[in-house]
């Protein structure tokens, strides 16, 4: 990897990158409201489960598949993947939040990195999944597939941790400790993703999906999902 590629990936994975992800907890706020997540320890436990299930088998695997479809120049495969990912989002808030983040990420990356390979999909469906956009950027800048996937995993967890710092709340030092704690799990997840078949896309934690559905009925909310 060149220094320039490294800097591009660091910029893209920065939690301050304005994709809008900071406005979404993707169901974690339901656990916070019910006091199932109330401190660094309980968040750590939930985060590990998230990494080992939904992040690995849905978002992370989707990023790998998207990269491979881009390598094969298969717009049909990307379109099918995009439709499948949104169909897997059972909770309305999560589905809409993912759509908004994906659209914002696509617009930013189109302007910044010149990623125009996804224009046809966006124009046809009016939606694009963030994992697909991330894969497109990784391939555009010449980052290896495995590096792109691992960076996407870290970026996703970094956003969740920063949102937990605000939502629980936690100290900034606790947040950084959680990121260090998560790194071996992310490396392991990336290695698992390399071995998965496309048919395994979509395995998730049922409890988290239910929490995502319940979120829209919370009387007080800090996050949009």
UniProtKB/Swiss-Prot annotation:
InterPro entries: UreF, UreF_sf. GO terms for cellular component: cytoplasm. GO terms for molecular function: nickel cation binding. It is found in: Cytoplasm. Pfam families: UreF (PF01730). Required for maturation of urease via the functional incorporation of the urease nickel metallocenter. UreD, UreF and UreG form a complex that acts as a GTP-hydrolysis-dependent molecular chaperone, activating the urease apoprotein by helping to assemble the nickel containing metallocenter of UreC. The UreE protein probably delivers the nickel. HAMAP family: UreF. Belongs to the UreF family. This is Urease accessory protein UreF. The gene is ureF.
């Amino acid at each position: 990897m060149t220094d320039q590629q490294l800097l591009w990936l660091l910029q893209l994975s920065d939690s301050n990158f304005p994709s809008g992800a900071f406005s979404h907890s993707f169901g974690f706020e339901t656990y916070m409201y019910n006091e199932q997540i109330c401190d660094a320890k309980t968040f750590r436990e939930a985060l590990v489960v998230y990494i080992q299930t939904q992040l690995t088998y849905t978002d992370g695997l989707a990023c790998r598949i998207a990269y491979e479809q881009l390598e094969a120049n298969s717009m049909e495969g990307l379109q099918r993947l995009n439709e499948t990912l949104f169909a897997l989002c059972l909770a309305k808030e999560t589905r809409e939040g993912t759509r908004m983040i994906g659209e914002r990420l696509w617009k930013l990356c189109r302007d910044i990195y010149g990623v125009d390979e996804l224009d046809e999909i966006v124009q046809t469906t009016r939606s694009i999944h963030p994992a697909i956009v991330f894969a497109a950027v990784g391939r555009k800048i010449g980052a290896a597939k495995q590096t792109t996937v691992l960076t996407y995993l870290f970026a996703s967890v970094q956003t969740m941790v920063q949102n937990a710092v605000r939502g629980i709340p936690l100290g900034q030092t606790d947040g950084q400790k959680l990121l260090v704690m998560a790194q071996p799990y992310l490396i392991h997840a990336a290695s698992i993703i390399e071995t998965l078949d496309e048919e395994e896309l979509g395995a998730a934690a049922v409890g988290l999906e239910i929490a995502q559905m319940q979120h829209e009925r919370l009387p007080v909310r800090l996050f949009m999902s």
